Amino acid sequence: MQVSDFHFDLPDELIARYPMAERTASRLLQLDGQSGALRHGQFVDVLDQLNPGDLLVFNNTRVIPARMFGQKASGGKLEVLVERILDEHSVLAHVRASKAPKPGTRLILDGGPDGEKVDAEMRARHDALFEIHFLDPRPVLEILEAIGHMPLPPYIDRPDEDADKERYQTVYNQKPGAVAAPTAGLHFDEPLLAKIRAKGVETAFVTLHVGAGTFQPVRVDKIEDHHMHSEYAEVPQEVVDAIAATRARGGRVIAVGTTSVRSLESAAKASLALSKPLAPFFSDTDIFIFPGYQFQVVDAMVTNFHLPESTLIMLVSAFAGYDHVMAAYQAAVAEQYRFFSYGDAMFVTRRRAVA
């Protein structure tokens, strides 16, 4: 398939620049992957789509304040976006500057409300990423909390605000490391989670530290030629056990977000390669899911509306059928749903392969 097959026209005013006042106030477009049938509603309707005995799998990554501003010691402004924490004092990062810093370049980073500055050094370059070492005794996470900004996606097209520290973060986040939010999870608040559990729906948590690569455009014509960026994922034993128990009782595995889908399917892919049943997974993954992929774990998913020609709309198309998904997106535009990270959501069931 061609990347252009996944294009759709999106009016600029449908891009959500701010979240709704309440997490659960978003709209929900329900898509039956088997028939293509659509149903319009509110996000709280997700409760009606869940059955006792189902398993809801969330991504518990925490977004770090990964964007920093500063200058080279010799002058020249720069912007740093952390991609991955290497150790207590070093990161891999994207650097925007008029001239890329060379190894040994001293950096002066700031951004704290009290004018705090942090010294750092560019140690090495790894393709498009720069290895930056902080010349500060504090751990990286503490430095980022002091001077970093929330790394809002480029299409939100505004500076981060104090409210984003809470709203560009799920209520169940636990493990710091993401530089983009697992956005399907932003719609859940504690009262809704309590209702879900009260209904007899089980919950489990995987971790995938979403990287900035999630916003990179696909730069090839044929989707088969695309190489995914790599991200770290964890599927612990308790999740494997929960999936087995769900299967045994006839329940469904429902992933909240494409990152949860990719985590679970990465674990399945690794296990399948060893001809073994589903096993825990703690590794980098560059799994690329596009039409033709055979899903091993996930039966339904909650997901936001994604960018045209993105790997994420390709994943959803693989899940529910290309024609069904593109028709759903056209309907969403016509009905003026809000798109992308702070936008509305879909509840999608899987299209079963024809025997």
Swiss-Prot record:
Kindly state a single biological-process term from the GO annotations of this entry: queuosine biosynthetic process
Q: Where in the cell is it found?
A: Cytoplasm
Question: What Pfam family is a match, any one?
Answer: Queuosine_synth
Question: What Gene3D superfamilies would the database entry show?
Answer: QueA-like (3.40.1780.10)
| Single GO molecular function | S-adenosylmethionine:tRNA ribosyltransferase-isomerase activity
Q: Which reaction does it catalyse?
A: 7-aminomethyl-7-carbaguanosine(34) in tRNA + S-adenosyl-L-methionine = epoxyqueuosine(34) in tRNA + adenine + L-methionine + 2 H(+)
Enzyme class comes to transferase
List the pathway annotation. tRNA modification; tRNA-queuosine biosynthesis
Query: Which GO cellular component does the record give, naming just one?
Result: cytoplasm
Q: Which InterPro entries match?
A: QueA, QueA_dom1, QueA_dom2, QueA_sf
EC numbers, comma separated: 2.4.99.17
Q: Which UniProt keywords apply?
A: Cytoplasm, Queuosine biosynthesis, S-adenosyl-L-methionine, Transferase
The entry describes its oligomerization and partners as:
Monomer.
- Which NCBIfam families did the record assign? PRK00147.1 (NF001140), queA (TIGR00113)
What does the protein in this record do? Answer: Transfers and isomerizes the ribose moiety from AdoMet to the 7-aminomethyl group of 7-deazaguanine (preQ1-tRNA) to give epoxyqueuosine (oQ-tRNA).
Family matches, as PANTHER family: S-ADENOSYLMETHIONINE:TRNA RIBOSYLTRANSFERASE-ISOMERASE
> Which HAMAP family does this UniProt record tie to the protein?
QueA
Q: Which family does it belong to?
A: Belongs to the QueA family.
Q: What is this protein called?
A: S-adenosylmethionine:tRNA ribosyltransferase-isomerase
Which species is this UniProt entry from? Answer: Aeromonas salmonicida (strain A449)
